[in-house]
Curated annotation (Swiss-Prot):
GO cellular component, one term: cytoplasm
Quaternary structure note: Homodimer.
Organism: Colwellia psychrerythraea (strain 34H / ATCC BAA-681) (Vibrio psychroerythus)
Protein name: Selenide, water dikinase
Names of required cofactors: Mg(2+)
Similarity annotation: Belongs to the selenophosphate synthase 1 family. Class I subfamily.
Gene name in the database record: selD
Length: 344
């Protein structure tokens, strides 16, 4: 076990490094006409998880990239988490990953190259678990450690799961518990108890491979993964893109054990407030704890899945077959204001 604390070498952590949604919207605005290409099935106009390009014979190639600063101190775990997080975008589209290349920024005058080697070994382990090669990459000398992957995948075009095709009446499911940003903030503040040290990393190192199986279900109308914009942010993207609203049962939202204890100790990521400022106007009243948990930036978070109500039994049965015991966390309703509200 290394004595290096990687989180002390970066100003951000994991997907909490993301630029806020409101600022990103300004950056991505352009007066240039977008090129028309009918083969581009999914681009950046819908804020989806990855791009999909039609390559013929009902097949699409999926392309995505994701990288960030350390969210844990252990280099191998950092590599595993970053790899899981990047590959997740392929699964969120319903696809199968086939190859990855690494993106590495490293402060070579501050951190030994052997530590970067451990990061890469962690990524290789996850790529092997996903059945894909880490086939290359690019590195630069950077003031802070940064790592991630660019990932390529394949998909049957009929099975593409977008984030803007949900329907009124759909049930909402979340495949991983919330609280990752809160727990990793507790670690950075030195408040995390040793017996809780693996709660967040274990979730973050779990591949969202079940997304491939969800893609084969017609009753799954939309899917995305929950990362830096938190559950509320990614749910809002789904609702606004689909022209619907959502009602969430807060008590049914899964969360990591002991997360409320760390909220009480003030272990709140800076990204919580940035997220709420960006989209809070579209959300109904929240208690302080509800706001923190629902706006908590997730790294390598779970899949948010919209399921037709008549598909509830089949969907939950598939989940149970794959070790997931899921219950609906809410449902989609006709568009209204606020776009997302909590069950009273």
């Amino acid at each position: 076990m290394t004595s290096i604390r990687l989180t002390q070498y970066s100003h951000g952590a994991g997907c909490g490094c993301k630029i806020s949604p409101s600022v990103l919207d300004v950056m991505l605005k352009s007066s240039l006409a977008l090129p028309v290409n009918d083969a581009l099935l999914v681009g950046n106009s819908t804020k989806d998880d990855a791009a999909v390009f039609d390559i013929g014979n009902d097949q699409g190639v999926i392309s995505t990239t994701d990288f960030f600063m350390p969210i844990v101190d252990d280099p191998t775990d950092f590599g595993k988490i970053a790899a899981c997080n990047a590959i997740s975008d392929i699964y969120a589209m319903g696809g199968k990953p086939i190859m990855a290349i690494a993106i590495l920024g490293w402060p070579v005058n501050l951190l030994a190259p052997e530590i970067a080697q451990q990061v890469l070994d962690g990524a290789r382990a996850i790529c092997a678990e996903a059945g894909i090669p880490l086939a290359g990459g690019h590195s630069i000398d950077a003031p802070e450690p940064i790592f991630g992957l660019a990932v390529t995948g394949l998909i049957n075009n009929a099975h593409i799961k977008r984030n803007n095709t949900a329907e009124v009446g759909d049930l909402l499911y979340l495949t991983k518990p919330l609280g990752i940003g809160i727990m990793t903030t507790a670690e950075k503040q030195g408040k995390l108890l040793p017996e809780h040290a693996q709660l967040a990393p274990q979730a973050m190192k779990t591949l969202n491979v079940i997304g491939q199986k969800f893609a084969e279900l017609e009753v799954v109308t939309a899917m995305t993964d929950v990362t830096g914009f938190a559950l509320l942010g990614h749910l809002l993207e789904m609702c606004q893109g689909s022209g619907v609203a959502a009602v969430i049962d807060f008590e049914q939202v899964p969360r990591l054990d002991f997360v409320n204890d760390y909220i009480d100790q003030g272990c709140v990521p800076g990204g919580c407030e940035r997220n709420f400022i960006s989209y809070g106007e579209h959300v109904g009243p929240l208690s302080p704890k509800q706001k923190i948990l629902l706006c908590d930036p997730q790294t390598s978070g779970g899949l948010l899945v919209a399921v037709k109500p008549q598909g509830k039994e089949a969907f939950e049965a598939l989940c149970q077959e794959n070790g997931l015991n899921l219950q609906p966390i809410g449902e989609l309703v006709a568009a209204t204001s606020p776009t997302v509200s909590l069950l009273s």
